[in-house]
Amino acid sequence: MTEGLVNTLATNLSGRVAIVTGAARGLGRAIAEKLCASGAQVACVDVSAELLGETVAALRANGWTAEGYPCDVTNSQRVNEVVDEVVKKWGGLDILVNNAGITRDTMVMRMKDDQWDAVLDINLKGTFLFIRAAARPMMKGRRGRIINMASVSGMTGNPGQANYSASKAGVIGLTRTVARELAGRNITVNAVAPGFIATEMTAALGEQILEEVKKRIPLGRLGEPGDVANAVLFLASDAASFVTGHVLTVDGGLTA
């Protein structure tokens, strides 16, 4: 009984302010829901204002505190504006979840410049821009949690995903470096590396390919968005106060 109470308190985010990018759907929405349910005030960021509005409305319908901020994560000026607006509204920033990301899959010899650039810009540059903007208010508050979305593809590589794998490998390197830079200010920086998760992105692979994928996963199934959200909650919470520079795989044993 006591152990359960301690665990609940450790992941209680009441009074904490969080930014989640790519929050309008998929993993980002699941993460926003999890943080809200744990007591955080969540600033939902996404390039799609329409989908963002639907997500924020759904969060508020549960009695949670959420605001929507339309933003292209590759636009440095807009990123800075969003962070400033969040800090002004809620008095600080405690948690940043860099989840926004895209794929433009094709074999490397067929990959066009714009396919490479778009993935690197959103997945890696967007992560950097939000870290840079969020670091200042976190340093001022002498506390922070930064969680970046990596991927097992950034650890092992994946045919047809040279751009995506490179961007996620870059996120891992960025995570470890910034973890060292900000540790002295009590700011932890970690990454979550999902494997195959049941989202719109994986559904597009088709049933036949997904059945083959499941055979490669020791647990024999795809992960759920909630599995990733739980990992993010842990890293955002006091339960992970001594964890930094770490990459937490959520892949059902795929990379074991």
Predicted regions and their residues:
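C-terminal substrate-recognition "lid" of short-chain dehydrogenase/reductases
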Residues: 128-131, 187, 221-250, 255
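Substrate-binding pocket helix/loop in short-chain dehydrogenase/reductase
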Residues: 107-108, 112-120, 213
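Conserved glycine-rich Rossmann-like NAD(P)H-binding loop of the short-chain dehydrogenase/reductase
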Residues: 38-54
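Residue(s) in the substrate-gating loop at a strand-loop-helix junction
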Residues: 151
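Alpha-helical segment proximal to the catalytic Tyr-Lys
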Residues: 136, 180-184, 241
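Active-site helix of classical SDR
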Residues: 131, 167, 175
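The beta1-alpha1 cofactor-binding region of Rossmann-like NAD(H)/NADP(H)-dependent oxidoreductases
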Residues: 49-50, 70-81, 113, 226-227
